Amino acid sequence: HSFSLTTFDPSGKLNQVERSSDASAKGTPVIAILRHDTILMASPQVCPSAFIEDDGTARFVRITPDIIVSHSGLSADGRVLVQIAQRVAVQHKYTFDENIQIDILLEEISLLFQEYTIKAAARPFGCTLIVAHLPSIGDHDLGVKPAIYQVDPSGA
């Protein structure tokens, strides 16, 4: 099982995904709280040393008027994934002339995460995405409720 990065070990785990999950867990924490029709997201702005400047990565990014994404783990991977989420949302808007639905965005992001667990010459993303969906007032009448989602390095 150790000859390939994409081969499951006897216990049913992919070592690369385990390492990516560890990297994600060591990142700056993001807290998301859902209460009634409100979502609160918070994360400390931590600089590990006085000799290191903040990398300038936005911790929270609005993808659509209803969707906000945050990441924890490797900042470089988080930036790439946020840019991909933005691109997917823009392509959907351009193609269908409507904002992307949360389930479609989550599926696209999850597929990308999962693809990188099996892709040759690539490693899984070392970050976790927290996706907050706060639908507009009109969508509440349709039964759409606010929700918080997490996408981990395995794509789950």
Identify the meaning behind each predicted range.
Residues 1-156:
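Long, low-complexity N-terminal extensions
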